[in-house]
């Protein structure tokens, strides 16, 4: 057990310091914005320092563990720890939240509450990724929904209340299954309830019971990821939310579903995962094609990007279902890669909306000449989204592709068929990405906007865009930087399926 509570400080620091926002003077919003930004930067530096100096990459076991008894009656512990699987998403959370805070600079209405909710969400997400106790994982999972709901319902488009209600109904419905699964696993087969991940990972269940648990967790994570048909909240939510909230949703929230699938469904329930993995692969392939073919029909720019996110999540599902080292590494790389790409696309969609007050592509056109910087950034990020070689999306999708082809668990013909379907999805992706660029930036100027709106990206917006673009290029050129974090843990997880 770790002597100094690094992880507890990392989890609690944003919400504790965030609650002091309400004590700051009300003279303008600048003090509060800088205060929030400083908290995010401090938290990111603290996390990076802890992982650099106290985390061994070659050890697949849980490190920096903390174990404090919390509720004596229920044997409930505040149990934290990280391994190769959680280190990437935690660093991604810190990076995206810091940039989302900077992106939220124009927010002036109820700015104190807005920034506090962003910091509360930050704590909940890091808590979810670093929990080593199932009930604590559930509590963090639920705690993080409250700020998201308030961010969606209070700031955004005209239909924001509808989309926020839809979001909370879907996620709360999924959470019921998550709670039943958590309590079922914790109370099964022993006199004393245990919710410790390490203990549960070595416990075996009757296959029928394991399948029931698996389905419960799968529904909860399928809503968050999202897996079709649980995806309909996502386009509505992204279409209405403020773009800084969209960055957090696309960059981190969706990845929590993928993380849960690997952490709980794969690690704790390997027999059921073997049974369900062919189904996951089929659903993933259908999802890639379905979302990629639905996206070109969306005239709302943010909804089109939302459907592209759903399509990219299909690769993560296939990687998780492939039961191979390469496939799972590809899925984890896609989690990180799409976190940057999705956040950057929504940020640029939001900055273009700030200028022209339009979201519908058929009303846009000819923006390349008045907004050259925005045009350049959005073009490069669209290329990253369609998996251009040299950018992070390409490496992740290629690894998933190789992972399914080299998997030892499937016959040759099904593997070829799935690879063919994935290839069709990869061909459909440029269709909606490039048509989006064509409708926005080329052709005649269709909209009537006074010229004073037409200033190109300022220093703040360029800084956020470039900060998101650099990791995308970096991972594309040297993917081992991210893969080295998780490769040992992935081998440990996959070995369960071959030696158990």
Swiss-Prot record:
Cellular localisation: Plastid, Chloroplast thylakoid membrane
Membrane topology: Multi-pass membrane protein
Ranges annotated as spanning the membrane: 4-24, 37-57, 87-107, 111-131, 134-154, 167-187, 208-228, 242-262, 272-292, 305-325, 330-350, 386-406, 416-436, 462-482
Swiss-Prot/TrEMBL catalytic activity: a plastoquinone + NADH + (n+1) H(+)(in) = a plastoquinol + NAD(+) + n H(+)(out); a plastoquinone + NADPH + (n+1) H(+)(in) = a plastoquinol + NADP(+) + n H(+)(out)
UniProt-listed Enzyme Commission number(s): 7.1.1.-
Record's keyword annotation contains Ion transport: no
A single cellular component GO annotation: chloroplast thylakoid membrane
A Pfam family reported for this protein in Swiss-Prot or TrEMBL: Proton_antipo_M
GO molecular function, one term: NADH dehydrogenase (ubiquinone) activity
Keywords for this protein: Chloroplast, Membrane, NAD, NADP, Plastid, Plastoquinone, Quinone, Thylakoid, Translocase, Transmembrane, Transmembrane helix
A GO biological-process term: ATP synthesis coupled electron transport
Disulfide pairings: none
Family indicated by similarity: Belongs to the complex I subunit 4 family.
HAMAP family: NDH1_NuoM
Classification via NCBIfam families: NDH_I_M (TIGR01972)
Name the UniProt record assigns to this protein: NAD(P)H-quinone oxidoreductase chain 4, chloroplastic
Source organism of this protein record: Oenothera biennis (German evening primrose)
């Amino acid at each position: 057990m770790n002597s100094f509570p690094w992880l507890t400080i990392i989890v609690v620091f944003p919400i504790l310091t965030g609650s002091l926002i309400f004590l700051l003077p009300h003279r303008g919003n600048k003090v509060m914005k800088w205060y929030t930004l400083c908290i995010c930067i401090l938290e990111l530096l603290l996390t990076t320092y802890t992982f650099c100096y106290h985390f061994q990459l070659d050890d697949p076991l849980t490190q920096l563990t903390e174990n404090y008894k919390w509720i004596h009656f229920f044997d409930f512990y505040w149990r934290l720890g990280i391994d190769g699987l959680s280190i990437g998403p935690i660093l991604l959370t810190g990076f995206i939240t810091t940039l989302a805070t900077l992106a939220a600079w124009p927010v002036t209405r109820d700015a104190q509450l807005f920034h506090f909710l962003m910091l509360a969400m930050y704590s909940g997400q890091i808590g979810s990724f670093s929990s080593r106790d199932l009930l604590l994982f559930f509590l963090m999972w639920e705690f993080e929904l409250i700020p998201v709901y308030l961010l969606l319902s209070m700031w955004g488009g005209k239909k924001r209340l509808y989309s926020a209600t839809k979001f909370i109904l879907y996620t709360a419905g999924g959470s019921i299954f998550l709670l039943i699964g958590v309590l079922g696993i914790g109370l099964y087969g022993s006199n004393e309830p245990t919710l410790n991940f390490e203990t549960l990972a070595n416990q075996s269940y009757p296959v029928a019971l394991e399948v029931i648990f698996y389905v419960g967790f799968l529904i909860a994570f399928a809503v968050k990821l999202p897996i079709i048909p649980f995806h309909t909240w996502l386009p509505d939510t992204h279409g209405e939310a403020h773009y800084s909230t969209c960055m957090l949703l696309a960059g981190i929230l969706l990845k929590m579903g993928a993380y849960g699938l690997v952490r709980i469904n794969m690690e704790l329930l390997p027999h059921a995962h073997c049974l369900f993995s062919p189904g996951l692969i089929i659903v993933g392939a259908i999802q890639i094609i379905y979302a990629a073919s639905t996206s070109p029909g969306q005239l709302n720019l943010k909804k089109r990007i939302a459907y592209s996110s759903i399509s990219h999540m299909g690769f993560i599902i296939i990687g998780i279902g492939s039961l191979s080292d390469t496939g799972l590494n590809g899925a984890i790389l896609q989690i990180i890669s799409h976190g940057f790409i999705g956040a950057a696309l929504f940020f640029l969609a939001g900055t273009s909306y700030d200028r022209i007050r339009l979201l519908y592509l058929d009303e846009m056109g000819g923006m390349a000449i008045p907004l050259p910087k925005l045009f350049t950034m959005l073009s490069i990020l669209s290329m990253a989204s369609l998996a251009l070689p040299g950018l992070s999306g390409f490496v992740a999708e290629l690894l998933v592709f190789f992972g399914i082809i080299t998997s030892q668990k499937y016959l040759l013909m099904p593997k070829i068929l799935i690879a063919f379907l994935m290839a069709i999805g990869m061909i459909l992706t440029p269709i909606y990405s490039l048509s989006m660029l064509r409708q926005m930036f080329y052709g005649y100027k269709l909209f009537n906007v006074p010229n004073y709106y037409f200033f190109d990206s300022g220093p703040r917006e360029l800084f956020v865009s470039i900060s998101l673009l650099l990791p995308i290029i970096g991972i594309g050129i040297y993917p081992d930087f991210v893969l080295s974090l998780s490769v040992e843990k992935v081998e440990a997880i996959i070995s369960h399926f071959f030696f158990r």
